[in-house]
Amino acid sequence: MDHMLPSPYNIPGIGTPLHQPEEDQQILPNAMQQQQLQQQQSQAQPSLAALGSSPIVGFGAIMGTPQRSMHTYAPTASYATPQQMMQPQTPQNMMSPMIAAGNLSSQQMLSQASPAPMTPLTPLSADPGILPQLQNIVSTVNLDCKLDLKKIALHARNAEYNPKRFAAVIMRIREPRTTALIFSSGKMVCTGAKSEEDSRLAARKYARIIQKLGFTAKFLDFKIQNMVGSCDVKFPIRLEGLVLTHGQFSSYEPELFPGLIYRMVKPRIVLLIFVSGKVVLTGAKVREEIYEAFDNIYPILKSFKKQ
């Protein structure tokens, strides 16, 4: 064996180690990163021993790896906190502010859209635009003295007296535009006013005129006896069906009178209802009775609306 010629091929023996490049000649992937990592680990060993932490946790703390805190924080979509900017931008993190904002906006919308406690539907709330208007107020007053109607008719302006036709002086004034019926007993009736204040003012003016004629007239027991209001419901009404359904309260004779007469029990009001939708309310002592009667009759009229 020792005298054999050397082979042209360098075949190593069994115990001959393979030729390995030197350590500084080896080509390793990510050599620079690993070298830096080893240096940082060697520098971190004393601090790790002092902290008593594991190398991974200590290395992460030294390298500044972002750690999630245990407390929860609900970010808004309007701005990003420094902690959010340091966290890795994963799709979940990027979507979380939008989801939180969406939940917040949906809660606000639900709170706004939640209905308020509903009240029972009343005729006034069903159509608040319709309000009866006062057309005439009849009031009475006691002048508390005997009157000479011929003297009043001769000396007063805008006064007429025909005892064969009517046993009272009819006197008119322009403001408020009203008419007075003056009786010899000292009683007076004032009609034509559109409001309670105008009716009282007109009655005082008539009493003052009679005082100027030489009578000791006073102003006692002024009282409103009747109020008349009217309104339009703006739709035609089936009066035949109304009188059949509410026969105990109403009467309808189109050959005698074109309107249906409806006598309401409470309030004690008489209504004249026409097929055109016009309604006249009379018999009230205060205007609230007019409004209450219309509130009661409006849903009935709406149920008999012509199609």
UniProtKB/Swiss-Prot annotation:
Keywords attached to this entry: DNA-binding, Nucleus, Repeat, Transcription
Keyword Nucleus applies: yes
InterPro entries listed in its UniProt record: TBP, TBP_CS, TBP_dom_sf, TBP_eukaryotic
Molecular function (Gene Ontology), one example: DNA binding
GO biological process, one term: DNA-templated transcription initiation
Gene3D superfamilies: TATA-Binding Protein (3.30.310.10)
Annotated region (Disordered), positions in chain: 1-21
Sequence repeat positions: 134-210, 224-301
Major subcellular site: nucleus
GO cellular component: nucleus; transcription factor TFIID complex
Subcellular location: Nucleus
Record keyword DNA-binding present: yes
PANTHER family (UniProt xref): TATA-BOX BINDING PROTEIN (PTHR10126)
Family (UniProt): Belongs to the TBP family.
Record's function text: General transcription factor that functions at the core of the DNA-binding multiprotein factor TFIID. Binding of TFIID to the TATA box is the initial transcriptional step of the pre-initiation complex (PIC), playing a role in the activation of eukaryotic genes transcribed by RNA polymerase II.
Assembly and interaction partners: Belongs to the TFIID complex together with the TBP-associated factors (TAFs). Binds DNA as monomer.
Full protein name: TATA-box-binding protein
Species annotation: Bombyx mori (Silk moth)
Lineage: Eukaryota, Metazoa, Ecdysozoa, Arthropoda, Hexapoda
